[in-house]
């Protein structure tokens, strides 16, 4: 049990509502702006007298800058303070979003998107690290579930809302609203900083340790194995999810509408991470991860055959979303608790592993889908997820006692 968990024993009854709201809203804003580009592409192409394929590069630019932003800005949290890293990310996000809203040519729009991607790369992993720093151990799964569910909420509500605003008013208003949301998150974090400073002054002075290096972070027990599990889970997920819509369009006559409705069922399941995270807090995070990865492995192999029954397809998509959100919540929570000193850098590796899986999952499974169909994609993605499951069994046997001791201490 680390010192962070010792502190949690004294504060376990205090749910950090303000902090949870700030982090959830920040990730929601970042996720919404990342995803809202797709429905706005025709309007953007018309505004800048360009082609949709050219404007689509703004999505790639955003992704590349996430890779740069995470290792560049997140270590500020380890060296100085998490708030500094969060505020730096938010200020860059606001500036980038305002540039997008004001852009009169495609160059400045791409510049704004690049800054927004840089900001997301800094804010999201730092938000995960802050949960490990500030949230009592008994509430970590619940708060991490809130943050994870904000990605799903961005897809279900943020993107349609942004698209609606762009259609009714103007696409520029979409970015103005996201910028205002960023300002609101800044105010919430400043309030949280003030509250934390008062609490810190009333307690004992904390001893600062050197921040360490990325290599030091990889030497922390549990980190390499759970980063690998993250990669296995994410590449299996994105490889399967990338072609789900295309497969459903081929199976059903409703085209995009039918496929969109089925994918929404997955999103509803994913948004349940607040509930599943709370349950995982009670039965144990590492044990819950075993169950989630086992269920996902079976689902991925069977999903291509689910359309034979409408009930089976709906149930499979909902359970897949439920288990995937639980897995993401658990992995981010477990990794954030591995090391207080290296927490920021650990979450950088988590973010990089997830984003690398996004790229490789669709790229590697594309040729497989074209040549052999969705069933082959399902078997390969299931096999990769099984590898993550096997690693999680190994990790539970080797490190499970650490979590059990922490839970026993917190229950006393």
Swiss-Prot record:
<feature type="transmembrane region" description="Helical">
    <location>
        <begin position="225"/>
        <end position="245"/>
    </location>
</feature>
<dbReference type="GO" id="GO:0005886">
    <property type="term" value="C:plasma membrane"/>
</dbReference>
<feature type="transmembrane region" description="Helical">
    <location>
        <begin position="257"/>
        <end position="277"/>
    </location>
</feature>
<keyword id="KW-0472">Membrane</keyword>
<keyword id="KW-1003">Cell membrane</keyword>
<dbReference type="InterPro" id="IPR036259">
    <property type="entry name" value="MFS_trans_sf"/>
</dbReference>
<feature type="transmembrane region" description="Helical">
    <location>
        <begin position="112"/>
        <end position="132"/>
    </location>
</feature>
<feature type="transmembrane region" description="Helical">
    <location>
        <begin position="146"/>
        <end position="166"/>
    </location>
</feature>
<dbReference type="InterPro" id="IPR020846">
    <property type="entry name" value="MFS_dom"/>
</dbReference>
<protein>
    <recommendedName>
        <fullName>Uncharacterized MFS-type transporter YwfA</fullName>
    </recommendedName>
</protein>
<dbReference type="GO" id="GO:0055085">
    <property type="term" value="P:transmembrane transport"/>
</dbReference>
<dbReference type="Pfam" id="PF07690">
    <property type="entry name" value="MFS_1"/>
</dbReference>
<feature type="transmembrane region" description="Helical">
    <location>
        <begin position="54"/>
        <end position="74"/>
    </location>
</feature>
<dbReference type="InterPro" id="IPR011701">
    <property type="entry name" value="MFS"/>
</dbReference>
<dbReference type="InterPro" id="IPR050189">
    <property type="entry name" value="MFS_Efflux_Transporters"/>
</dbReference>
<keyword id="KW-0813">Transport</keyword>
<feature type="transmembrane region" description="Helical">
    <location>
        <begin position="17"/>
        <end position="37"/>
    </location>
</feature>
<keyword id="KW-1133">Transmembrane helix</keyword>
<feature type="transmembrane region" description="Helical">
    <location>
        <begin position="346"/>
        <end position="366"/>
    </location>
</feature>
<feature type="transmembrane region" description="Helical">
    <location>
        <begin position="91"/>
        <end position="111"/>
    </location>
</feature>
<comment type="similarity">
    <text>Belongs to the major facilitator superfamily.</text>
</comment>
<dbReference type="GO" id="GO:0022857">
    <property type="term" value="F:transmembrane transporter activity"/>
</dbReference>
<feature type="transmembrane region" description="Helical">
    <location>
        <begin position="173"/>
        <end position="193"/>
    </location>
</feature>
<feature type="transmembrane region" description="Helical">
    <location>
        <begin position="299"/>
        <end position="319"/>
    </location>
</feature>
<feature type="transmembrane region" description="Helical">
    <location>
        <begin position="375"/>
        <end position="395"/>
    </location>
</feature>
<keyword id="KW-0812">Transmembrane</keyword>
């Amino acid at each position: 049990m680390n010192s962070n968990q010792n502190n949690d024993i004294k504060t376990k009854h205090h749910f950090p509502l303000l902090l949870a709201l700030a982090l959830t809203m920040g990730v929601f804003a970042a996720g919404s702006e990342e995803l809202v580009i797709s429905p706005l592409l025709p309007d953007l192409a018309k505004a800048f007298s360009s082609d949709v394929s050219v404007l689509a590069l703004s999505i790639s630019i955003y992704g590349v800058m996430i890779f740069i932003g995470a290792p560049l800005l997140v270590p500020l949290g380890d060296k100085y303070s998490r708030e500094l890293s969060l505020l730096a990310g938010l200020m860059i996000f606001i500036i980038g979003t305002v540039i997008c809203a004001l852009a009169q040519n495609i160059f400045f729009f791409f510049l704004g998107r690049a800054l927004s991607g840089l900001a997301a790369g800094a804010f999201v992993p730092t938000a995960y690290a802050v949960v490990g720093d500030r949230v009592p151990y008994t509430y970590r799964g619940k708060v991490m579930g809130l943050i994870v569910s904000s990605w799903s909420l961005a897809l279900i509500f943020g993107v349609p809302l942004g698209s609606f605003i762009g259609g009714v008013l103007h696409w520029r208003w979409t970015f103005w609203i996201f910028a205002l949301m960023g300002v609101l998150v800044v105010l919430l974090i400043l309030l949280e900083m003030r509250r934390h400073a008062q609490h810190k002054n009333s307690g004992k002075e904390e001893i600062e340790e050197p921040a360490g290096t990325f290599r030091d972070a990889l030497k922390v027990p549990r980190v390499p194995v759970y980063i690998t599990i993250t990669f296995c889970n994410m590449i299996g997920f994105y490889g399967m999810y990338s072609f789900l819509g295309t497969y459903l369009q081929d199976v059903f006559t409703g085209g995009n509408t039918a496929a969109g409705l089925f994918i929404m069922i997955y999103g509803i399941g994913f948004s349940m991470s607040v509930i599943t995270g709370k349950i995982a807090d009670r039965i144990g995070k590492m044990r819950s991860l075993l169950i989630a990865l086992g269920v996902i492995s079976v689902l991925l192999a069977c999903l291509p055959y689910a359309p034979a029954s409408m009930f089976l397809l709906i149930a499979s998509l909902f359970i897949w979303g439920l288990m995937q959100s639980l897995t993401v919540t658990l992995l981010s929570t477990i990794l954030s608790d591995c090391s207080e000193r290296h927490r920021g850098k650990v979450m950088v590796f988590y973010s990089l592993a997830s984003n690398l899986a996004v790229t490789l999952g669709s790229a590697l499974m594309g040729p497989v889908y074209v040549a052999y169909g969705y069933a082959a994609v399902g078997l390969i993605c299931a096999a990769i997820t099984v590898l993550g499951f096997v690693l999680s069994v190994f990790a539970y046997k080797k490190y499970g006692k650490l979590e059990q001791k922490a839970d026993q201490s917190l229950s006393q």
